[in-house]
Curated annotation (Swiss-Prot):
Covalent S-S links between cysteines: none
InterPro entries (alphabetical): PCRF, Pep_chain_release_fac_I, Pep_chain_release_fac_I_sf, Prokaryotic/Mito_RF, RF-1
Identification of the protein by name: Peptide chain release factor 1
PTM (free text): Methylated by PrmC. Methylation increases the termination efficiency of RF1.
Modification sites for N5-methylglutamine: 233
Alphabetized UniProt keyword annotations: Cytoplasm, Methylation, Protein biosynthesis
Subcellular location: Cytoplasm
Protein encoded by which gene: prfA
GO molecular function: translation release factor activity, codon specific
Pfam families xrefs: PCRF, RF-1
Free-text function comment from the UniProt entry: Peptide chain release factor 1 directs the termination of translation in response to the peptide chain termination codons UAG and UAA.
Length: 359
């Protein structure tokens, strides 16, 4: 591990010098590439340097404990040594996590698909609330949200919404949101105060570039139709809405939010690429899981991942047993604590798998 860290620190120093080189500074493409590589190593190298500082401090403290004759000073040195050793252990664990192979999709933009499931109007209202929650969280991260396609319900909810979220680390933060989100509450139309249960499905897909997934023109069929609003009524007399069918997989994407057919087609292709890319990623994950003879983090969308219980003012994530009691704040986009808990959990799982594989 430490030989690898030494090599990475040397690479970091090399990149630091390169960023000051006129040859790099005057070439925008080279500078961006070098700066990106430098940024990816910064946290790891800083943590490794902290580790080395702590080991030097421990060496000095041990020497002081061994040589000190004054009882009070010896006790002070021993206390300091214990604290340094505890910090060293924590930093070493951090280094192990930072050395885990990065998910190549972590820095990608994402396509978020939210669909109302069981529960009728109540499910559509909750779908709209979830979309607002992700919007508010995106604002805190300074990400850009753009709706690609949406279908409203007659009560002001959303039957479906597909949006792209653009920003650094979007996939790394929201990739664990895929699955079934269950809501328990008393609908406004309920006269007897009974709690109803509804469900909404969320899918988070890394946006695929054209280099990630190639789609041949012969493999798609594009149909055009008039845009429609809630209830199916036509809202546009021109054929601006598009339906794209990927013939080999029978994957269908519809987009009608823009008045321009060209823009709807562009948005539809972005969604199609993301869905086909996810299929390829899932095939690879399934093959890897089969090889290991165990299912490894499939992110199954049919899995119930979270329950939002309004009468009890709590949110529970069933995968890690994490409960939040400030439901209104959570729905207002304050979801970072849960995101960090999920990230820590799955990093620990990866470490466990890595340790098992080595042994």
């Amino acid at each position: 591990m430490f030989e690898r860290l030494d090599l990475m620190e040397a690479k970091y120093d090399e990149l630091t010098q390169a960023l000051a080189s006129p040859e790099i500074v005057n070439d925008s493409a080279k500078y961006q590439k070098t700066a990106k590589a430098h940024a990816e190593l910064t946290q790891l190298v800083q943590k490794y340097r902290e580790y080395k500082d702590l080991t030097r401090g421990i060496k000095d403290s041990r020497q002081m404990v061994a040589e000190e004759t004054d009882a009070e000073m010896k006790a002070y040195a021993q206390q300091e040594l214990t604290e340094l050793e505890q910090r060293l252990h924590a930093v070493e664990e951090d280094l192990k996590v930072l050395l885990l192979p990065r998910d190549p999709n972590d820095d990608k933009n994402i396509i978020v698909e939210i669909r109302a499931g069981t529960g009728g109007d109540e499910a559509s209202l909750f779908a709209a609330e979830l979309f607002r929650m992700y919007n508010r969280y995106a604002e805190t991260q300074r990400w850009k949200v753009e709706v690609l396609s949406s279908s409203e319900s007659g009560v002001g909810g959303l039957k479906e919404v597909i949006a792209i979220i653009e920003g650094r680390g979007a996939y790394s933060k929201l990739k664990y949101e895929s699955g079934v989100h269950r809501v328990q509450r008393v609908p406004q139309t309920e006269t007897q105060g009974r709690v109803h249960t509804s469900a909404v499905t969320v899918a988070v897909l890394p946006e695929a570039e054209e280099v990630d997934i190639k789609i041949e023109a012969k493999d798609i069929r594009i149909d055009t139709f008039c845009s429609s609003g809630p209830g199916g009524q036509s809202v546009n007399t021109t054929y601006s809405a598009v339906r794209i069918t990927h013939l080999p997989t029978n994957t269908v994407v519809s987009c009608q939010d823009e008045k321009s057919q060209i823009k709807n087609r562009e948005k539809g292709m972005r969604v199609l690429r993301a869905r086909l890319y996810e299929v390829e990623q899932q095939k690879q994950a399934d093959a890897l899981a089969k090889e290991r003879k165990q299912q490894v983090g499939s992110g199954d969308r049919s899995e119930k991942i979270r329950t939002y219980n309004f009468p009890q003012n709590r949110v529970t994530d069933h995968r890690i047993g994490y409960t939040v009691h400030q439901l209104s704040e959570f729905m207002d986009g304050k979801i970072n604590a849960l995101i960090e808990a999920l990230t820590t959990h799955y990093q620990a799982e990866k470490l466990k798998e890595q340790t098992t594989a080595v042994s």
